[in-house]
Amino acid sequence: MGTEQTVRSFSRHAAAGAVSIIEGNRGLFDGVNAAGEFSTGELAKLLNAPVILVVDCDKVTRTAAAMVLGCRNLDPQLNIRGVILSRVSGSRHATVIRQAIEEYAGLPVLGTVPRMTDLPFTQRHLGLIPPPEHDAAQHALDRAGMIAEDCLDIPNLLAVGESAAPWSVDAFPNPEQDERGNEPITIGVIKDSAFQFYYSENLEALSDRGAKIVEISALAEKSLPDVDALYIGGGFPETQAGRLAENASFRLSLKAAAERGLPIYAECGGFIYLGESLTIGDAHYPMSGALPVSFSMEHRPQGHGYITLEVDRQNPFFPVGTKVTGHEFHYCRVLTLHESESFTACRVLRGTGMDGKREGLCRYNIFAGFTHLHALGAAGWAQAIIGKARQHRAERQSKIISPSLRKRDAGGF
């Protein structure tokens, strides 16, 4: 998303707190190209945010100072205010690194975190296990809090945050916030342990335009409730494949709704669930069957990073010619695809998508793929879902009304 959208998002979400902590992605200068565009460093400059470097100190001492000094000198416009040392082996190790950084890089060390073998947060193929699947999530957070309290100079870290210039929440008001229809519509969002990855701005973009968001569980509910459109985000259907397969009544109701023309937008995990089956090793799990495609879970990522698409076929949500940018990270690949019963709407310009060439599988009123998009960087996405939902609602209402009209026209009144 662009500069204005980024600032608007930050302003909106930072309004409730005195200090906002922004977690950097990858290294400070790592972006989409050699110039570091869209990097953490560029974001820090855009938001006028002070930077705290977290330095991996495993098996290094004075070299840590060279890394910190290099970060300071590579872009002097960055406001780097301090350093946190990570994976330190002991007090002597920490003292040597601290002295080197303070002498050669001229920055204070605001925390020293020791190397830990029993980390409170467990991981798997796509990163940390998310709270809905973590039996001891609160315990892990409590332990992480104690580690932070023991190892970080929290008063000085907060002082760095408080030194940043204040933001006006209305600096970039959302120009689309009042684009609402007169009649409310309902958009279902499948949200449970299997489907849990949603950008908050995506849901806000829908509710800002008048949609009522209804959360649905594909694991616990017996059937899909009455909604005007459905949004199925990413998640981990592979870890819940058995439970998803066992809930046959929900799977069948979802397929039936798709066949009746329910507008459905699905990303990654949602795409997999709309398919016919998911193969994990020697096990095969039936999915909803709304799309004529099957998937296989692999041991290595099949797509990871930014993705750019060009829409070249008519579909339920994007005009032909639209450029769609997003992110993909999936271990699943398409195993079989019956192209005679469906079609792909997008050409892959960058990234992998379904096969390195095509993305966005369509059937009925479904658009599904591995791409995660962000509403603030996808102009028209929310409006398109709202529009399709209103259209579907009107079509259903006309079918309900038409029998009584036919009866009256036949002489009933």
Give names to the regions the model predicted.
Residues 49, 107, 259-263:
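A short helix->loop->beta-strand "cap" motif at the edges of active sites that frequently abuts
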Residues 195-205, 212, 297, 304-398, ...:
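C-terminal and late-domain segments of enzyme folds
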Residues 183-259:
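Phosphate-binding active sites in nucleotide-utilizing proteins
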Residues 1-47, 55-82, 91-95:
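ATP-dependent carboxylate-amine ligase catalytic core
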